[in-house]
Amino acid sequence: MPSLKDLRNRITSVKATQKITKAMQMVAAAKLRRAQNAAENGRPYAERMAQVLGNLAGNLIGGVGAPRLLSGTGQDRVHLLVVCTGDRGLAGAFNSSIARLARDHANRLMADGKTVKIITIGKKGLDVLRRQFRDQIIASRDIRGNKPVDYPFAAEIADDILARFEAGEFDVATLFYSEFRSVISQIPTAQKLIPAELPTAEGASATGAGSDAAMEFEPNEETILETLLPKNLTVQIFRALLENAASEQGARMSAMDSATRNAGEMIKKQTLIYNRTRQAMITKELIEIISGAEAL
């Protein structure tokens, strides 16, 4: 049985931990509101841009003149996996779920005889994936600590991917991130970046992006797509980073709330044990005093 001193130290330690988890929960809640607003504001722009590009590309996919970012290389041998996680832990299954989705995808590709290359965004994804894919990881970036992600950072990533594609380093690129649904729901997601997956003209019309009217473009569709597809690559990566930021804060807030409640339960349990132990010691001492008095 632990001594009273051990129990007091244990209770003090758990209370200190509870203060830390409570503070982290409050910080995550404050950051979540800003990150959630940014993610929700970025979605319509990214979706609308994809719809516009889908309208433009409706008659070009697979045809002559289609940009390579849209039609691809015509091969399926080398796959680039861009895995976006966070730099910090204590966020529940946020980082591990994204890394697991990417790992399973990589294993399937390698089982089919494909070559896999990986770029990690965030320290935690790098830590997990390099255990199995050290030779496949060709680049890694941090999320710049606690600073919120910005568009130039997404543009740097997109430019690197685009340069590697133009150099013929890969055929297909897939982005892995966590889509934010709510504080308790973040969905690990895989999105194909190259060749770009765009809504069809029919799908864009159904969502209001299209029209039955005949449209002419100046310059032509090919030229517009050549200009907008690289920008769309940046936009989709930026959206993924915003979704990730909101998902990370939501997961951390939920995890720290659970840790705070668990610490409270542990404090109650340890306090009860402490009181019972103290009561037993007092009772034992009283019995010894009474027995000694009777012996006299």
Curated annotation (Swiss-Prot):
Question: CDD domains, per this entry?
Answer: F1-ATPase_gamma
Q: Which Gene3D superfamilies match?
A: 3.40.1380.10, ATP synthase, gamma subunit, helix hairpin domain
The alphabetical list of record keywords is:
ATP synthesis, Cell inner membrane, Cell membrane, CF(1), Hydrogen ion transport, Ion transport, Membrane, Transport
One cellular-component annotation, GO = plasma membrane
Q: How does it sit in the membrane?
A: Peripheral membrane protein
Q: Pfam families, per this entry?
A: ATP-synt
Tell me the GO BP annotations in alphabetical order. Answer: proton motive force-driven plasma membrane ATP synthesis
Record localization? Cell inner membrane
Major location (coarse) = membrane
Which SUPFAM superfamilies does the entry link to? ATP synthase (F1-ATPase), gamma subunit
Reported function: Produces ATP from ADP in the presence of a proton gradient across the membrane. The gamma chain is believed to be important in regulating ATPase activity and the flow of protons through the CF(0) complex.
Q: Of which family is this protein a member?
A: Belongs to the ATPase gamma chain family.
Q: How does it assemble?
A: F-type ATPases have 2 components, CF(1) - the catalytic core - and CF(0) - the membrane proton channel. CF(1) has five subunits: alpha(3), beta(3), gamma(1), delta(1), epsilon(1). CF(0) has three main subunits: a, b and c.
Which protein are we looking at? ATP synthase gamma chain
Q: Which gene encodes it?
A: atpG
